[in-house]
Amino acid sequence: MKTALFLLFALVFIAVEARFCTPGQRIRAPDGCNWCRCTKGGRIGGCTKMFCRKNLVKMDCKPGKKFKIDCNTCICSKEGKAAACTQKLCLKKRPKRSLINIEKSERNCKPGQNYMSKDRCKKCVCMKDGNSACTKVKC
């Protein structure tokens, strides 16, 4: 019971501490690396945006050089032995797949006319050049 009360008190204290601060006070940012200033309203305001040690990637590179790894931007350290990188989630680009096939028209048709393929599986439209654009569907 005492432990539960202590934990409840600690959580309330942490929540209150996180929401309010002394105006003008310098506070360590949640990342443990950057610093923030407390606003006149007692809230955490502007913070520094330094690259933090936990964001370092060990590598040999040209000191001060900026480069990309996937979608993240990195800058090489002064020593040229590590780089500080942003930590964005990079989604791999999928190759573009065509949803239609351009093929010789199966029949004489008027440009803009829609029809079903002979196998009755694909929807097609006649184009001005005499070819057809048909959906790519496996039957």
Swiss-Prot record:
Disulfide feature: C21-C38, C33-C52, C36-C47, C61-C76, C71-C90, C74-C85, C109-C126, C121-C139, C124-C134
Primary subcellular site in the record, as a coarse category: secreted
Alphabetic keyword roster: Cleavage on pair of basic residues, Disulfide bond, Protease inhibitor, Repeat, Secreted, Serine protease inhibitor, Signal
Tissue: Expressed by the venom gland.
Transmembrane segments: none
InterPro entries, A to Z: Pacifastin_dom, Pacifastin_dom_sf, Prtase-inh_pacifastin
Domain of life of the source: Eukaryota
Domain (Pacifastin) ranges: 19-55, 58-93, 106-139
Record carries keyword Signal: yes
Site entry (Reactive bond), positions: Q87, K88
Compartments reported by the entry: Secreted
One GO molecular-function entry: serine-type endopeptidase inhibitor activity
GO CC annotations on file: extracellular region
UniProt record similarity statement: Belongs to the protease inhibitor I19 family.
Role noted for this protein: Inhibits trypsin activity and prophenoloxidase (PPO) activation, an enzyme essential for both clotting and insect innate immune responses. It does not inhibit activity of chymotrypsin and protease K, and has no effect on phenoloxidase (PO) activity.
Protein's recorded name: U-reduvitoxin-Pr21
Lineage: Eukaryota, Metazoa, Ecdysozoa, Arthropoda, Hexapoda
